[in-house]
């Protein structure tokens, strides 16, 4: 009797498994299962599926032309494909989308998109059996009415537009077309390229946790003033080994090649983007510029944290991307530690990053503070030049630093605190500063108003503050009282310029080669050594330029002599 029951249960179980398997197989084609079950199945990605793509052009001379389609059916990507450079013409990409559960038997989903003059079904190997559909701008769509395709990684689920011959898309699951859209001669300078995402939205990026290496070391590279453009950009003040101005060159490829080489040679644990990553006036699509430096870091799996300079959000109102929008984009990118910070204080990008001790410890070993130094003076008549760190930022910093001290005391070695801003503090411009490890080539363009932030940094135990902005300065400095200080506990913090990294920004001043600043931290000794790496030339390519010990045993080190 017992055997019969067991046999019956086994047979029913096998039948149930077979039935479920059959239902799931049929569902891949005919969608039998309810949406609630689909959402639990990793093969499904509920959300918007692209069913069509088209391009519209319009002319301000023709009142009957329009770049708007029926908004109940089409979503317009809000980027003029001419980047507002067309005298009378505009063009926009439109995408038709449906939710997966709303697809009918008559709907087709886009599974591939190409751009080219020839039908991929005729000109490409392996595509002869496919029925490609043409759209304006030399767009070709491959669409499918098979239900299983809407549930697979074949389905196109998002479309975007980037610009420039050097455009890249580092977002997971996205791929960019190699051929630009065919518009007309007016758009050739900044070619518009479609980029698409196949399959579901990838899992939200996991927070990157920077950590001290097993040997107790941690290395930071500070990139300042990259001045990247939409498209390749034009070099400014590019010189050769003899100091002679070189001919025309493309700024961004040269900048990225230089930075990529240093990243590979120095192998940093973290990159600080010190502001003016984007050269607003030559970057009508800031997203394309941002993706170029992000790709450089994401492809190498290097965590990075960014602040803004005065040029990042410049440019014509029609095309410029606000600080808020840029930070929103950056904060979602892989390996990014960038954050907008509290929305009740001035600026965008006031935040801190904790670098943890060696695994498995969860204690902080280093705290890096990032603050928005804003842009131009809000009171040009009284204080000419640039803006300053605001009182509510200083209050936020002070309260944050004090709140972390108890937790930091749990670290078994010496905890170190550093800060990064873009525009130098007024103390950078003080007469009689003790200058070391670099050159003072141009006057400091610090704010005319001193809000007292340097004093607060000192009170809270910050050992160094790095800045950019003045491209051809690359020195470190201590305030004048450091020269005669009897107690080094009252000295500092060090103020260090990074030096300009990008060929899209100015240089000159008697011959200046682009550079980056390296911060090498040895937590076993509470020590920081810093130097620069340069883009040119000869033996200097491998040298540590202006190497300087600035902190030892957790205390600021005063060098024996300046220079």
Regions found by a protein language model. Give the residues of each.
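Acidic, histidine-bearing metal-coordination/catalytic regions of metal-dependent phosphoesterases
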Residues: 1-244, 536-553, 558, 562-563
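Extended active-site neighborhood of metal-dependent phosphoesterases/phosphodiesterases
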Residues: 180-212, 292-403, 407, 516-518
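Beta-strand-turn-beta hairpins that frame and shape the catalytic cleft
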Residues: 210-221, 352-370, 478-495, 525
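Active-site-proximal beta-strand elements of phosphoester/diester hydrolases
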Residues: 217-230, 365-379, 420, 493-500
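Divalent metal-coordination and catalytic microenvironments
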Residues: 225, 259, 271, 276, ...
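Acidic/histidine-rich helix-loop elements
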Residues: 227-254, 278-285, 381-386, 436-442, ...
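Active-site environment of divalent metal-dependent phosphoester hydrolases
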Residues: 227-232, 279-282, 306-318, 377-379, ...
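His/acidic metal-ligating clusters that form di-metal
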Residues: 266-269, 361, 367-370, 381-480
């Amino acid at each position: 009797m017992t055997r019969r029951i067991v046999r019956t249960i086994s047979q029913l179980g096998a039948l149930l498994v077979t039935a479920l398997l059959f239902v799931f197989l049929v569902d891949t084609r005919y969608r039998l299962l309810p949406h609630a079950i689909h959402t639990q199945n990793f093969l499904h990605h509920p959300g918007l599926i692209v069913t069509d793509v088209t391009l519209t052009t319009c002319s301000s001379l023709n009142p009957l032309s329009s770049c708007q389609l029926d908004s109940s059916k089409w979503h317009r990507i809000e980027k003029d494909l001419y980047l507002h450079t067309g005298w009378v013409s505009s063009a926009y990409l439109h995408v038709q989308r449906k939710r997966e559960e709303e697809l009918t038997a008559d709907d087709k989903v886009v599974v591939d998109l190409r751009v080219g003059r020839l039908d991929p079904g005729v000109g490409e190997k392996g595509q002869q059996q496919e029925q490609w559909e043409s759209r304006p701008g030399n767009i070709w769509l491959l669409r499918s009415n098979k239900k299983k395709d809407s549930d697979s990684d074949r389905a196109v689920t998002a479309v975007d537009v980037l610009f420039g011959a050097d455009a890249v898309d580092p977002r997971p699951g996205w791929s960019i077309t190699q051929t630009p859209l065919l518009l007309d001669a007016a758009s050739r300078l900044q070619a518009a390229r479609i980029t698409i995402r196949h399959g579901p939205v990838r899992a939200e990026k996991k927070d990157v946790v920077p950590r001290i290496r097993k040997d107790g070391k941690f290395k930071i590279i500070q990139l300042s003033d990259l001045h990247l453009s939409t498209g390749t950009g034009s070099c400014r003040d590019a010189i050769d080994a003899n100091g002679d101005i070189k001919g025309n060159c493309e700024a961004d490829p040269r900048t990225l090649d230089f930075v990529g080489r240093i990243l590979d040679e120095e192998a940093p644990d973290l990159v600080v983007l010190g502001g003016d990553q984007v050269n607003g006036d030559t970057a009508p699509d800031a997203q394309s510029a941002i993706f170029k430096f992000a790709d450089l870091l994401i492809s190498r799996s290097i965590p990075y944290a960014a602040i803004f300079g005065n040029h990042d959000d410049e440019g014509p109102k029609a095309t410029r991307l606000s600080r808020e929008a840029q930070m929103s984009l950056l904060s979602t990118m892989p390996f990014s530690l960038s954050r907008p910070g509290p929305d009740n204080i001035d600026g965008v990008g006031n935040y801190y990053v904790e670098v943890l001790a060696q695994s498995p410890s969860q204690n902080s070993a280093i705290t890096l503070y990032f603050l928005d130094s804003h842009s131009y003076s809000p009171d040009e008549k009284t204080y000419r030049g640039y803006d300053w760190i605001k009182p509510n930022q200083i209050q936020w910093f002070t309260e944050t630093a004090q709140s972390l001290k108890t937790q930091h005391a749990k670290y078994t070695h010496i905890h170190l605190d550093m800060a990064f801003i873009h525009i130098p503090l007024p103390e950078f411009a003080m007469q009689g500063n003790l200058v070391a490890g670099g050159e003072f080539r141009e006057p400091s363009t610090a704010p005319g108003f001193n809000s007292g932030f340097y004093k607060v940094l000192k009170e809270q135990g910050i050992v160094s503050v790095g800045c950019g902005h003045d491209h051809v300065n690359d020195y470190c400095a201590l305030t004048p009282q450091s020269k005669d200080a009897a107690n080094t506990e009252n000295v500092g913090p060090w103020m260090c310029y990074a030096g300009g990294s990008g060929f899209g920004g100015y240089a000159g001043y008697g011959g200046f080669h682009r550079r980056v600043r390296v911060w090498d931290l040895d937590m076993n000794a509470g020590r920081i050594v810093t130097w620069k790496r340069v883009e040119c030339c000869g033996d200097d390519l491998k040298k540590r330029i202006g190497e300087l010990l600035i902190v030892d045993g957790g205390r600021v080190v005063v060098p024996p002599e300046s220079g």
